[in-house]
Amino acid sequence: MDVENTVVEILADLTGNDDIKDDMDMDLFETGTLDSMATVQLLLELQGQLDIDVPVSEFDRNEWATPNKIIAKAKELQ
């Protein structure tokens, strides 16, 4: 599975919302789709499935706010 599909699947699983792929520029924090607990789970899933290490202390919410931004960061860190 490629990075984009993996991220979308992780987000859908974490949020229970399969419609994430319909709006890849939706701000996941402003809409309440992701909270701090889900963010930690997201980072753990990215680490486990894509071998990407993002220390929580270095996490900048603005850089990870939308599905498209998450995909871009994941590709950058691979």
Curated annotation (Swiss-Prot):
Keywords: Cell wall biogenesis/degradation, Cytoplasm, Phosphopantetheine, Phosphoprotein
Coarse class of the protein's main subcellular location: cytoplasm
Domain of life from the UniProt record: Bacteria
InterPro entries xref list: ACP-like_sf, DltC, PP-bd_ACP
Residue positions where O-(pantetheine 4'-phosphoryl)serine is found in the record: S36
Localization terms from the record: Cytoplasm
One GO CC annotation: cytoplasm
GO molecular function, one term: D-alanyl carrier activity
Domain Carrier, residue spans: 1-78
Pfam families: PP-binding
Record SUPFAM superfamilies: ACP-like
Pathway(s) of this molecule: Cell wall biogenesis; lipoteichoic acid biosynthesis
Xref: NCBIfam families: dltC, PRK05087.1
Homology family: Belongs to the DltC family.
Role, per record: Carrier protein involved in the D-alanylation of lipoteichoic acid (LTA). The loading of thioester-linked D-alanine onto DltC is catalyzed by D-alanine--D-alanyl carrier protein ligase DltA. The DltC-carried D-alanyl group is further transferred to cell membrane phosphatidylglycerol (PG) by forming an ester bond, probably catalyzed by DltD. D-alanylation of LTA plays an important role in modulating the properties of the cell wall in Gram-positive bacteria, influencing the net charge of the cell wall.
Name of protein: D-alanyl carrier protein
Biological source species: Latilactobacillus sakei subsp. sakei (strain 23K) (Lactobacillus sakei subsp. sakei)
Classification lineage: Bacteria, Bacillati, Bacillota, Bacilli, Lactobacillales
Gene that this sequence comes from: dltC
